[in-house]
C-alpha cells in the first residue's frame, strides 16, 4: 500500500505545483492585459472629449456672431455672443466656461462672468492661438475660480480683427471620464499624472492609505515622452504593478495600478480552483480503478 500511496501523493504534489506555477503566470498575464486595456479606455475617453471640444470650437470660430463681437462692442453683439456660448455649453456640458478675447488678451464676452478686469495676454494658450495655432494647455488655475482647468483655444477673426475663442474644462469634469464607468474595478487604483508623475487626480481602492502627491516609478520616467508601458512602484510597504498610457494632445498620463497582494489573491483563488479540480480528477480515477479491480 505504501509503494502505491507515496508515488500517488508525490504525483499529486508535483501536479499541484506545476498547476500553481502555470495558473499564476496565466492569471498575471490576464490581470496585466486588463490593466492595460483599462488605461487605453480611460486615456481615449479623455482624448475624444478634448478633441470634440477642439473640433467644435474650430467650427464655432467661423461663426458670424463671433466675428461681429470682435468688430463691435455694442450691447446687442455682446448678448448675441453670450447666447451663442450658452448654446455651446448646452451641446457640450463638459465645458466649464467659454470666453472670447480680443487681440490684446482682454475679455470681450464670457459665459460665466463678465470678468472684464483680467487680461489673458500672458497665458500660453492665448499666445499660441493669437499666432494662428490651436492650443491645448493645462492644468492651470483659473482666474475666476480656484480650480485647475484645461484650456482649449482657437484663433478667430481676420487680419483686421483678431481674437481667441477659449473653452475651459475643470479637472473635476475630466475625473468623470476617468472614474465613473463600469470598467473600473474596486480593486484597482486610477491616476491622472503629469509628465513628472505628479498626481493630478486619483481614485484609490483603499481609503486607509492615500498615495503621496507624486509616484516614484522604479527605473522609469514619464518626461522622456514614452507613450505607454508597464511600471512598478513601491508605496506604504506594498509593491504595485501598473500600466500607463499617454493622453493624446495633453502632456498627461493615465496610470492603472493594482498592488501585488491583490494580484496574488486573484492568482491564488484561481489556482486553488484548478488544484481542487486536479485532485478531484485523480480521486475519481483511483475510485474507478478500485471498482474495476
Regions found by a protein language model. Name each.
Residues 1-72, 90-94:
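Juxtamembrane extracytoplasmic/periplasmic/luminal helical "stalk" adjacent to the first N-terminal
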Residues 158, 163, 206-277:
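Extracellular/periplasmic juxtamembrane segments that couple receptor/chemosensory ectodomains to their
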